[in-house]
């Protein structure tokens, strides 16, 4: 079993690294604005058609453009979901959503969270899935990558006050990266048996005479960008555990590759854009080491499972509850780590059915800000925030002015860094406290005790860190939870994005100092170790008390009870 786990983890990471390198080179060219003559003519015509201003933007203009696009997206999607009962491509006559569910869903997909307080096959029309959710999957992913592009330019440029053009970045990312990759991945999924049609649901009679309804729909096209864009919202309620979304072991492995592809490629792109590939490699080492340990722990917990089952006559103590037999314990455990280390939130097993400590690791991966690969764009700029914090602390320790890639890190950058790092944990802890201190919040808890607390903590952690996965034992389709989590998703996304762009705007105007003998090496094993330590320390100081009340207490209760 240990050998199988080793092969799964390292085989996945090795394949991702091989595939992501050429993509990273392409992304680096996009960061520098190198698109080629033919593509440049096409994007110029497209920009003219949409009347886009393609002049370079300062950070305030860049942030305003990103915020405006996302605000419009929330309004349009909200209206579409409310009105879907009166719109075409609705063969099952799905009614419009309630205002609070429509608000929650609109915010969820625009912020790249894809939290779902509904089951797609019972709630949404094909039009809502295609024109509403799938479009936002592209735009939210492009928004995150665009902000990462702006921050990378802040390090690669010097003595200018612009970060690029948000509209051109969004256009290029969508046309040259997300659409081609999604098309290829969707075709692969169709070859594996994922649905792609506009047929009405099929009503059948089984061999034993029972009635059965098989949902249909344009699944493969949404599934591709759901994974590549680290969105995670499933076409069906069971998400990637559903055989119409993830039918085979091969499709399951490819899904994990697709989730990790762009976050990994962005690290390579970062190194190439700043003319020091080892900087990108250092970030990847830090991410990969945390990922490997997290995956090993979850696999160990789920394989160990419940030893008391053996005394009851079970063939194995492994925790198979909530898992698909076509994937098994190890692959389901690895998928859980992949989807929570990134901001994806797609699931091929029910996280609520994991062991107490096995479920704690995905929860903790979200709580540290999803910087272990992270979401497309957001993972890179999230990890760079921790890099700046590490550089600052190291500078204090050795008595030197902190700098990163030749740019001095001063008071303003540290204020913005602290703000961006602390906002999501504050949202998690305050949101959980609010839910547990109100009748409306406690009313959604279906499981008493420590596990019920864990379900609330997981839900708010998932929303505030834009993940979207859930411990599904919590009843969240209520006005209280829909509004609470919508606010957490909005602030968790944009209250981090804006400080990141502010940091970029401050750094881009600075001179890039040459590296000297006294400069702190930010690509050495020592720095990688310090970076990992800072990430773990921030996570530990912030969340150990909450985790002790939830998963740890549940684990101890299990041991005492049995």
Swiss-Prot record:
**From the Swiss-Prot or TrEMBL record, what is one GO molecular function term?**
P-type potassium transmembrane transporter activity
Q: How does it sit in the membrane?
A: Multi-pass membrane protein
Query: Is the keyword Transmembrane assigned to this protein?
Result: yes
Q: What are the disulphide bonds in this sequence?
A: none
Does this entry carry the keyword Protein transport? no
Q: Where in the cell is it found?
A: Cell inner membrane
Keywords (alphabetical) are:
Cell inner membrane, Cell membrane, Ion transport, Membrane, Potassium, Potassium transport, Transmembrane, Transmembrane helix, Transport
The record's Pfam families line, in alphabetical order, gives:
KdpA
Q: What are the transmembrane regions?
A: 5-25, 63-83, 132-152, 175-195, 250-270, 279-299, 379-399, 416-436, 483-503, 526-546
GO terms for cellular component: plasma membrane
- Where does the protein principally reside? membrane
Report the function annotation for this chain: Part of the high-affinity ATP-driven potassium transport (or Kdp) system, which catalyzes the hydrolysis of ATP coupled with the electrogenic transport of potassium into the cytoplasm. This subunit binds the periplasmic potassium ions and delivers the ions to the membrane domain of KdpB through an intramembrane tunnel.
Q: Which family does it belong to?
A: Belongs to the KdpA family.
The subunit structure is: The system is composed of three essential subunits: KdpA, KdpB and KdpC.
Protein name (database record): Potassium-transporting ATPase potassium-binding subunit
Instruction: Please name the source species.
Output: Pectobacterium atrosepticum (strain SCRI 1043 / ATCC BAA-672) (Erwinia carotovora subsp. atroseptica)
Organism lineage reads as: Bacteria, Pseudomonadati, Pseudomonadota, Gammaproteobacteria, Enterobacterales
Gene from which the chain derives: kdpA
């Amino acid at each position: 079993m240990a050998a199988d786990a080793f092969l799964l983890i390292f085989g996945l990471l090795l394949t991702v690294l091989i595939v992501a390198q050429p993509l990273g080179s392409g992304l680096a060219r996009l960061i520098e604005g190198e698109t080629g003559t033919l593509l440049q003519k096409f994007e110029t015509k497209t920009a003219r058609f949409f009347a886009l201003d393609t002049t370079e933007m300062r950070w305030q203009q860049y942030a305003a453009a990103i915020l405006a696009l996302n605000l419009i997206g929330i309004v349009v999607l909200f209206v579409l979901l409310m009105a879907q009962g009166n719109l075409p491509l609705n063969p099952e006559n799905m009614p419009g959503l309630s205002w609070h569910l429509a608000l929650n869903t609109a915010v969820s997909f625009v912020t790249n969270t894809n939290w779902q307080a509904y089951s797609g096959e019972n709630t949404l029309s094909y039009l809502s899935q295609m024109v509403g959710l799938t479009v936002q999957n592209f735009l939210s992913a492009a928004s995150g990558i665009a902000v990462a592009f702006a921050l990378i330019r802040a390090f690669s440029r010097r003595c200018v006050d612009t970060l690029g053009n948000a509209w051109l970045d969004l256009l290029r990312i969508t046309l040259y990266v997300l659409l081609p990759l999604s098309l290829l991945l969707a075709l692969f999924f169709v070859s594996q048996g994922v649905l792609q049609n506009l047929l009405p649901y099929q009503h059948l009679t089984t061999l034993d005479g029972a009635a059965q309804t098989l949902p249909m729909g344009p699944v493969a096209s949404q599934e591709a960008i759901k994974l590549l864009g680290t969105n995670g919202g499933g076409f069906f309620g069971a998400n990637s555990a559903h055989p119409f979304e993830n039918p085979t072991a091969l499709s399951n492995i490819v899904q994990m590759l697709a989730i990790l592809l762009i976050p990994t490629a962005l690290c390579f792109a970062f190194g190439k854009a700043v003319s020091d590939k080892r900087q990108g490699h250092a970030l990847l080492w830090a991410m990969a080491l945390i990922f490997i340990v997290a995956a090993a722990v979850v696999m160990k917990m789920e394989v160990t499972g419940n030893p008391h089952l053996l005394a009851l006559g079970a063939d194995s103590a492994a925790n198979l509850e909530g898992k698909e037999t076509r994937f098994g314990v190890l692959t389901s455990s690895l998928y859980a780590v992949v989807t929570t280390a990134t901001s994806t939130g797609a699931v091929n097993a029910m996280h609520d059915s994991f062991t107490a400590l096995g479920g704690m690791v995905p929860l903790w991966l979200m709580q540290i800000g999803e910087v272990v690969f992270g979401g497309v764009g957001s993972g890179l700029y999230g990890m760079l925030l921790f890099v700046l914090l590490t550089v600052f602390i190291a500078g204090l320790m050795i008595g030197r002015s902190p700098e990163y890639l030749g740019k001095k890190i001063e008071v303003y950058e540290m204020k913005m860094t602290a703000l961006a790092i602390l906002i999501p944990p504050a949202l998690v802890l305050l949101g959980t406290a609010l839910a547990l201190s109100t009748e409306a919040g406690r009313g959604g808890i279906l499981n008493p005790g420590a596990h019920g607390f864990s379900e609330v903590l997981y839900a708010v952690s998932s929303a505030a860190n834009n993940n979207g996965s859930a411990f599904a034992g919590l009843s969240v389709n209520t006005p209280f939870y829909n509004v609470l989590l919508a606010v957490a998703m909005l602030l968790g996304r944009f209250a981090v994005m804006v400080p990141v762009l502010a940091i970029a705007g401050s750094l881009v105007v600075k001179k890039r100092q040459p590296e000297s003998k006294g400069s702190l090496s930010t690509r050495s094993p020592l720095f990688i170790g310090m970076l990992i330590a800072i990430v773990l320390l921030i996570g530990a100081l912030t969340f150990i008390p909450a985790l002790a009340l939830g998963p740890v207490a549940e684990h101890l209760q299990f041991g005492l009870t049995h």
